[in-house]
Amino acid sequence: MRTEYCGQLRLSHVGQQVTLCGWVNRRRDLGSLIFIDMRDREGIVQVFFDPDRADALKLASELRNEFCIQVTGTVRARDAKNVNADMATGEIEVLASSLTIINRADSLPLDANHVNTEEARLKYRYLDLRRPEMAQRLKTRAKITSLVRRFMDDHGFLDIETPMLTKATPEGARDYLVPSRVHKGKFYALPQSPQLFKQLLMMSGFDRYYQIVKCFRDEDLRADRQPEFTQIDVETSFMTAPQVREVMEALVRHLWLEVKGVDLGDFPVMTFAEAERRYGSDKPDLRNPMELVDVADLLKSVEFAVFAGPANDPKGRVAALRVPGGAQLSRKQIDDYGNFVKIYGAKGLAYIKVNERAKGLDGINSPVAKFLTADIVEAILERTGAQDGDMIFFGADNKKVVADALGALRLKLGKDLSLTDEDKWAPLWVIDFPMFEDDGEGGLTAMHHPFTAPRDMTASELKTAPEEAVANAYDMVINGYEVGGGSVRIHNGEMQQTVFGILGINEQEQREKFGFLLDALKYGTPPHAGLAFGLDRLTMLLTGTDNIRDVIAFPKTTAAACLMTEAPSFANQAALTELGIPVVKKAENN
């Protein structure tokens, strides 16, 4: 039906007869002439109808926005004064000789001239996706997946599919369950990841695997999460953690170079402990120049319990955050930031405004200055590198609260005061995570997942001191987003059972949930390691949007609902009966 895409016409097509198919983006009726902007997935081109083609002109008078049409005409160059530099096709136009209205459009529920609500955009997603910016994002996503496949194929990886209907295993979130009609009362689970299957593939001898795969997690959603999402899933045998990181870094550098024309360079590597200490986060945004600086040793003897208490507590921390130019902040702004850090458990926000450093105590403004000597103030200013016009905020509490509160404040100030370089790319690897963390109930939970191997520990050493274990794990972070994470896996049955035991999974439970894995580990399992990237998040970064729903064709809301299809929906009684699922009705209030 078409010979060319609208958005691909250029001066090289001048004089050619073309047939285009697409939609009316805009119509301008000048009486004897009618101009339309015609749109398809590749872009927009101007088409005009003149009196010499009376039939086409007459039919064009009926056109309205979003009519689906076919146009045949001749490409010609625009006069210099009519060139539109803002359009890729702005140097040419199409003189229409014939027009076919394929389908008319009713009054549109989305307004092209105004910002539509996200609810409306999701309800009429098929119209929203016609917008050039949305089409471009999905085209970029398609390009990314194509680049990934070619790169992985070139590096000897095999694309192998794993099951969608599998067994529920604890991986950190709730499973989506699918009832079995054949096995009444039993349920499949949709996979949260292909984790165990890709490990089993390594045990099967396929030493380089990848898959672009759908995963499902029934969890509370955030702006950058969806109940169903897509992973670039990777696993390798006989490769060390640095070797895996090297290949995966090369993949991401390849994507940025091909999609953005940007060479990311070599990624720095930072330990979890260093990231938390310097940035208050295990996914630091290195575009932001501010860092947390420890000052507890300077404050142990001050007559101010808010500082002295944590400074003398082995589990406590006192840290300072220097804000360049922050002395300009008003009292109201400071109070607002004080309320902000309370969200993260902080009790308040002490500060020092540096007006004239050379004047010592007389050159600062601080509600805690009366508790500090001139020498202590000077030592704090020296350590933080403070200059005239800066602000220093303090966090004093247990280590987690200080990291969480000042880490979040750092990000907020970076944005509010334009200190974060939005034009920069800042990737890094974060390694050496704790293997376990407190579950809040006196037990331990796996920081990544229970199949991650510890670094340099035997099973007996791990059993004796699990809190000291460092995971052989690694996360890739770009601009403060965790875009991928992975680890070296446990390939020894004794170690795997030890980890299960530390997590409170008894032997009977181990057999019920992971018997197939424990059996497989008995038969010459190779050392293996892998990683998974979030394709949605990678695409979000590469397309410059901050909403993950913008890069998914048909996303869910933050309530895990599809406004367009009205999913989820009630199942009819016959279907439930066939599945052996009884419906319990709530008793009515009398």
Swiss-Prot record:
Catalytic reaction annotation: tRNA(Asp) + L-aspartate + ATP = L-aspartyl-tRNA(Asp) + AMP + diphosphate
GO molecular function list: aspartate-tRNA ligase activity; ATP binding; nucleic acid binding
EC top class, as a word: ligase
Binding site residues for L-aspartate: 171, 217, 448, 489
GO cellular component: cytoplasm
Keywords assigned: Aminoacyl-tRNA synthetase, ATP-binding, Cytoplasm, Ligase, Nucleotide-binding, Protein biosynthesis
GO terms classed as biological process: aspartyl-tRNA aminoacylation
Subcellular location, record wording: Cytoplasm
Enzyme Commission number(s) from the entry: 6.1.1.12
Record flagged with keyword Secreted: no
Region named Aspartate: 195-198
Xref: InterPro entries: Aa-tRNA-synt_II, aa-tRNA-synth_II, aa-tRNA-synth_II/BPL/LPL, Asp-tRNA-ligase_1, Asp-tRNA-ligase_1_N, Asp/Asn-tRNA-synth_IIb, AspRS_core, GAD-like_sf
Keyword Plastid in annotation: no
Superkingdom of source: Bacteria
Binding residue positions for ATP: 217-219, 226, 482, 534-537
Chief localisation class: cytoplasm
Subunit field text: Homodimer.
Function: Catalyzes the attachment of L-aspartate to tRNA(Asp) in a two-step reaction: L-aspartate is first activated by ATP to form Asp-AMP and then transferred to the acceptor end of tRNA(Asp).
Protein family: Belongs to the class-II aminoacyl-tRNA synthetase family. Type 1 subfamily.
Name by which UniProt lists this protein: Aspartate--tRNA ligase
Organism: Salmonella paratyphi A (strain AKU_12601)
